[in-house]
Amino acid sequence: MTEPILKVNDLSVYYGKKKALHSVSIDFYPNEITSLIGPSGSGKSTLLRAINRMGDLNPEVTVTGSIIYNGHNIYSRRTDTVELRKEIGMVFQQPNPFPMTIYENVVYGLRLKGVKDKKILDEAVEKSLVGASIWDEVKDRLHDSAIGLSGGQQQRVCIARVLATSPKIILLDEPTSALDPISAGKIEDTLYGLKEKYTMLVVTRSMQQASRISNRTGFFLAGDLVEYGNTKEMFMNPQKQETEDYITGKFG
């Protein structure tokens, strides 16, 4: 059986005294898309941010438990968070390209690593934009501002920016919720094409999106992981009443 690429063990996250995640344990597998679903405030985005150690930036956040990646707990003192975030990249709900050219957006992480060779940078830009399914749309205007792109194009440039650092895992926090249906469909197609090379965790409020793109789905409610398993099986035959009620739209 395939070994998990990421193991979350007994993870709890607190914002001050408020417990946002309750002893969650969940494994993620290589070259799969996992959807995290649940109503607002259920803990799904909190889990994503814990995997990327974004809580480090907030003194109110306390994390207990462990997240094992490459055989090591990412919350150990030895973890280099800069290197971690290169291997576990993140794409946010609102497209957030930097106020610079499309080219410079994509190579931003490489420049931080000290890469200066133009050939290497050029190759990374093309490869990453191809991977994000936007190369043909922007190849003739790489030195135009990314801010001038449509929302869907901006989001795909943000995906390309993550791809350029050669991550193993990509975290996506509601990456299509701010986009129109056509742009959202292009993002879904892009993600589906990327799973041959990457492991992806996608927070989504769309049951249809989860059913279309993901291999596995985790349902969160009030900080608890209620159910986790094969997406088709969960949607056809949920094991918990809360899961069925959420999937069928009785609450959420």
From Swiss-Prot:
EC supergroup of this enzyme: translocase
Superkingdom field: Bacteria
Subcellular location: Cell membrane
Gene3D superfamilies: P-loop containing nucleotide triphosphate hydrolases
Catalysed reactions listed for this entry: phosphate(out) + ATP + H2O = ADP + 2 phosphate(in) + H(+)
Keywords: ATP-binding, Cell membrane, Membrane, Nucleotide-binding, Phosphate transport, Translocase, Transport
GO cellular component, one term: plasma membrane
Function description: Part of the ABC transporter complex PstSACB involved in phosphate import. Responsible for energy coupling to the transport system.
UniProt similarity note: Belongs to the ABC transporter superfamily. Phosphate importer (TC 3.A.1.7) family.
Name of the featured protein: Phosphate import ATP-binding protein PstB 1
Organism: Streptococcus mutans serotype c (strain ATCC 700610 / UA159)
Upper lineage: Bacteria, Bacillati, Bacillota, Bacilli, Lactobacillales
